[in-house]
């Protein structure tokens, strides 16, 4: 069974974990209703995508 020969220090552990964070999603604005939305997705508030009404919004 594989066992580490030396204890991993807090510095080495934290340097390894430096890239494990989640990045914030890019937020764009809807050109029709000016609400914030995720790119390449239908707008939640007005239901439009690429200038066309795709989904009936409530």
Swiss-Prot record:
Keywords: Ribonucleoprotein, Ribosomal protein. The keyword Mitochondrion does not apply. One of its GO terms (biological process) is translation. GO terms for cellular component: large ribosomal subunit. Residues 1-16 have a biased composition (Basic residues). InterPro entries: Ribosomal_bL32, Ribosomal_bL32_bact, Ribosomal_zn-bd. Residues 1-26 are annotated as: Disordered. It comes from the Bacteria. One of its GO terms (molecular function) is structural constituent of ribosome. SUPFAM superfamilies: Zn-binding ribosomal proteins (SSF57829). Belongs to the bacterial ribosomal protein bL32 family. This is Large ribosomal subunit protein bL32. It comes from Syntrophotalea carbinolica (strain DSM 2380 / NBRC 103641 / GraBd1) (Pelobacter carbinolicus). The lineage of its organism: Bacteria, Pseudomonadati, Thermodesulfobacteriota, Desulfuromonadia, Desulfuromonadales. The gene is rpmF.
């Amino acid at each position: 069974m594989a066992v580490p020969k030396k204890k991993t220090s807090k510095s080495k552990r934290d340097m390894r974990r430096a890239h494990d964070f989640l990045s914030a999603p890019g937020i764009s604005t809807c050109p029709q209703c000016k609400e914030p939305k995720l790119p390449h997705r239908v707008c939640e508030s007005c239901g439009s995508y690429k200038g066309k009404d795709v989904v009936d919004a409530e």
